[in-house]
């Protein structure tokens, strides 16, 4: 929160934040999960990987625990790496939501990351139903930009349309 302190001390309206909703992920990334299944990984193996991530077992130790499974299905190693890298997730995003509340007055726009929005207008790994109420309860009047990460080969127009509809639904618009 040193950045907030600097913003407050300078009073500048040109210094701020552009939060990326990917940091709130609480479930594994569907496109990576599906890709691993297609490459021969099992639900059991993937669930074990996810649980190790939830339990905050370090990646190096997790790779050792899963070594035999990775040997049988090399794609599992890549999926596991992604769970600790680009598409991380955690049990809860409460701490991150508290951080969002603190920086909201200094946000220019927000990146509404999505990887897969299902037909029921639910992003399966990022808890928009927790994020949007925090934004709605604030004085934020900027944009939430749809940032579709085309990882799974889904229809980008459909995914973007679903994301916009999901956010509007959560905002009761």
What are these regions (language model features)?
Residues 2-173:
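Histidine-acidic metal/acid-base catalytic patches
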